[in-house]
């Protein structure tokens, strides 16, 4: 295959990816957060996770495998695409807030139908050993996936554009993406594949202290601030709240390079925090009650 044909094939692949529905971090990003988590949980947590996978058949989703934590990290996006059975879960993947208004941690979460509330709900279901294994396995998948979602800046920050879905961008030489998917897919994948050292590894206590901790509301605020202070200004080369933003933008190679450490940090934080959620869910005793919304 000539270099020109190879580049054309790669371009076709990326454009094909761009046509898929937005899902935070894309499959590769979500699987990476799960791999990071699995490398950093306690051994007894890892064993408890493995004991749930035999219940996957009872969920009745053969088209969406659920035999590993990496599968669990993408399972909610897979089932959401299967039709009406899982349509009610669509609002659980995000909680966007306008970046040009004061952040309100209680907004856009009616009846718990938002990503931050569903992380807490799923963790409590997962921790309840009196529940059937298939119910806990479903909760495991939702918790792991949504904890990844909340770390994606454009699942929390919004400029009247559905978290960047309505802003067309050219990503390097690749046209016709949207801002949301540029961050979900190619940017996240490049951040993961170029990271040195590799993101999937055991982290030291000092690294975990610097990168992990907090709870879903705080993680959502971090993502909102990242969207406000970096994603939108970097994409449009201007303060995002001074007048209307254009509907189109170009992410140059320089823009992409500046964004890589931001994406890398959010993916790493997601993985380490998923590990903390898992360790807490499988630890003896009851979880603390979440703050009431």
Language model: regions and residue ranges:
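N-terminal, motif-rich segments that launch catalysis or mediate targeting to/interaction with membranes
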Residues: 23-146, 153-293
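N-terminal signal peptide c-region/cleavage motif recognized by signal peptidases
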Residues: 19-21
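Bacterial N-terminal signal peptides that target proteins for export
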Residues: 1-10
